[in-house]
Amino acid sequence: MKVHSSVLIEGEVEIPEDVEIGAYTVIQGNVKIGKGTKIGNRVTIKGNVTIGENCKIFDGAVIGEAPQHLKYEGEETSVEIGNNVIIREYVTIHRGTKLDKGKTVVGDNVMLMAYSHVAHDCVVGNNVIMANCATLGGHVVVGDYALIGGLSAVHQWARVGEHAMVGGLTGVSLDIPPYTVASGQHAKLYGINIIGLRRRGFPEEVIKAISKAYRIIFRSPLPRQKAPEIVFQELGQYEEVRKMVEFIKSSKRGVARHHKD
């Protein structure tokens, strides 16, 4: 184990032999760190935190700090981070609250760029990228392979669907459906994330089905409540379309609209 002499470790901390920890890092509490993980200088990890294998945590990151919530009373909550996660400089990930499931979750193969923030009770899926200074409010859910651009902010309790792309400097207050592109101060939809879907190997037939579903739901004159049912009837054989319909029907905050609405 390569641990700098200035590192402070307190509590029930599990650190495998091949983990590396840089200077002036502080690890306190019930912390479990997976094999092959590398932790930089001046990192803070505290509370109930589980970090997976082969993660890279850069200088100044803070993981497991108390949530920024006025009703938090010091209860035992946690942070769970998956495998192969990259956490760049000065990222902050806060632990959960009793108002939700009590834990903040970051999946596998996630990249959190410098100064991005994952608030209490968030659930970030696998293969997500958050660019510099992107911010998630409390209780936000981000689906697998979503991309959130730099300096964007997602309102508490909002959702970003899988394979969606949120442009830089975007304010997200309503749910962003899977496979879509959103942008703007008050996020609007700009169609399907075709480039991203092709890069990830989606068949053209599936992409066309998703595009048709988008047109029916967001660009046709059909009533917004009726359109998803029609899409399900016409294109329900496609799993991706079913996911889009289910996401929209389950929305509690409402769904972002097409930019020309």
Swiss-Prot record:
UniProt keyword annotations, A-Z: Acyltransferase, Cytoplasm, Lipid A biosynthesis, Lipid biosynthesis, Lipid metabolism, Repeat, Transferase
Enzymatic class: transferase
Protein's GO biological process: lipid A biosynthetic process
InterPro entries (UniProt xref): Acetyltransf_C, Acetyltransf_C_sf, Hexapep, Hexapep_transf_CS, Lipid_A_LpxA, Trimer_LpxA-like_sf
GO molecular function terms listed in the Swiss-Prot or TrEMBL record: acyl-[acyl-carrier-protein]-UDP-N-acetylglucosamine O-acyltransferase activity
One GO cellular component, as annotated: cytoplasm
HAMAP family noted in UniProt: LpxA
Function: Involved in the biosynthesis of lipid A, a phosphorylated glycolipid that anchors the lipopolysaccharide to the outer membrane of the cell.
Name of the molecule in the record: Acyl-[acyl-carrier-protein]--UDP-N-acetylglucosamine O-acyltransferase
Species for this entry: Aquifex aeolicus (strain VF5)
Lineage, broadest ranks: Bacteria, Pseudomonadati, Aquificota, Aquificia, Aquificales
